[in-house]
């Protein structure tokens, strides 16, 4: 069983949902980022979704774009992100780790080399945000060759064919987008048809569904679980805490700890 499967099975047995925070690797620096990620795990994160700093992110709203820029300004490369992942994995052998990336980042290194490096540092799953199902083949093949689980996004406007494709090709978990647009903690609305999408994904035996985009409050975690999702992903709200505490690292870690504890409590 993969780390994601093991974690979902453990949570199911306890009748709990998953809380998964997202941060950008090396934001604001390599060392601080490591401490931030440790704080997330130590305070109850069930899995991690992590991004590589990239100058032209597609789905990212202003908060996560700023995080990318901070890491890039600090001079951090994709190889630094891999080294940081290696450090996280050696400290936390069990935590499921997923990467959320743009295709260009993978392409720059070469598909095979990228997924091989993911396997070497202990990544479990990779979601390529801007690869449609129709263009998935090379990515899926490279991922599977190296034992990495490919994850796909189910958008709120997905038709039956897309839902079927996402369910069939995703491994580890399924990323259900709450609404159209870019990531943001401000826009906390979600599409009206999410419960139907969850039902349809489950009917096609999709892996456990994690709902993301606009998840900033414990009530939204409860809502995601009530809709039938297995858990919720929170990116912008997590990264915002880093952004507003750049001059006070201790305060940053304290606020992150409290945020994760509250969000995790909502899954029980």
Swiss-Prot record:
Biological or metabolic pathway of the protein: Amino-acid biosynthesis; L-tryptophan biosynthesis; L-tryptophan from chorismate: step 5/5
User: What's in the keyword line of the UniProt record?
Assistant: Amino-acid biosynthesis, Aromatic amino acid biosynthesis, Lyase, Tryptophan biosynthesis
Q: What's its job?
A: The alpha subunit is responsible for the aldol cleavage of indoleglycerol phosphate to indole and glyceraldehyde 3-phosphate.
Question: Which residues does the entry assign to the active site, renumbered to this chain?
Answer: 49 (proton acceptor), 60 (proton acceptor)
Q: PROSITE patterns under this entry?
A: TRP_SYNTHASE_ALPHA
Q: What is this protein called?
A: Tryptophan synthase alpha chain
Do you know which HAMAP family this protein is assigned to? Trp_synth_alpha
State how it assembles.
Tetramer of two alpha and two beta chains.
* GO MF annotations in UniProt: tryptophan synthase activity
Catalytic reactions of this protein: (1S,2R)-1-C-(indol-3-yl)glycerol 3-phosphate + L-serine = D-glyceraldehyde 3-phosphate + L-tryptophan + H2O
Family per similarity comment:
Belongs to the TrpA family.
Do the record's keywords include Lyase? Answer: yes
Enzyme group, top EC level?
lyase
What organism does the UniProt record list as the source? Answer: Haemophilus influenzae (strain PittEE)
Source taxon at top rank: Bacteria
Q: What cellular component terms from Gene Ontology apply here?
A: cytosol
Q: Give the E.C. number(s).
A: 4.2.1.20
| A Pfam family hit | Trp_syntA
């Amino acid at each position: 069983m993969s780390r994601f499967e093991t974690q979902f099975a453990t949570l199911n047995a306890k009748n709990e949902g998953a809380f998964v925070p997202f941060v950008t690797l090396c934001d604001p620096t390599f060392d601080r980022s490591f401490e931030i990620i440790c704080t997330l795990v130590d305070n109850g994160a069930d899995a991690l979704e992590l991004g590589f700093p990239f100058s032209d992110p597609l789905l990212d709203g202003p908060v996560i774009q700023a995080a990318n820029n901070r890491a890039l300004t600090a001079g951090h490369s994709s190889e630094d992100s891999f080294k940081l992942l290696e450090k996280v994995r050696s400290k936390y052998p069990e935590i499921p780790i997923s990467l959320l990336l743009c295709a260009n980042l993978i392409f720059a290194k070469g598909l095979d080399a990228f997924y091989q490096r993911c396997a070497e540092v202990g990544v479990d799953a990779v979601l390529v945000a801007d690869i449609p199902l129709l263009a998935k083949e090379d990515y899926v093949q490279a991922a599977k060759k190296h034992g990495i689980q490919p994850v796909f996004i189910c958008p709120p406007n997905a038709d039956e064919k897309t839902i079927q494709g996402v369910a069939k090709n995703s491994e580890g978990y399924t990323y259900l987008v709450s609404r159209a647009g870019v990531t943001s903690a401000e826009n906390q609305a979600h599409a009206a048809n999410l419960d139907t999408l969850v039902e349809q994904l489950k009917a096609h035996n999709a892996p456990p569904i994690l709902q993301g985009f606009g998840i900033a409050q414990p009530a939204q975690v409860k809502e995601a679980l009530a809709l039938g999702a297995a858990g919720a992903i929170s990116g912008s709200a997590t990264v915002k805490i880093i952004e507003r505490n750049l001059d006070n690292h201790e305060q940053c870690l304290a606020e992150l700890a409290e945020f994760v504890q509250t969000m995790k409590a909502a899954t029980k």
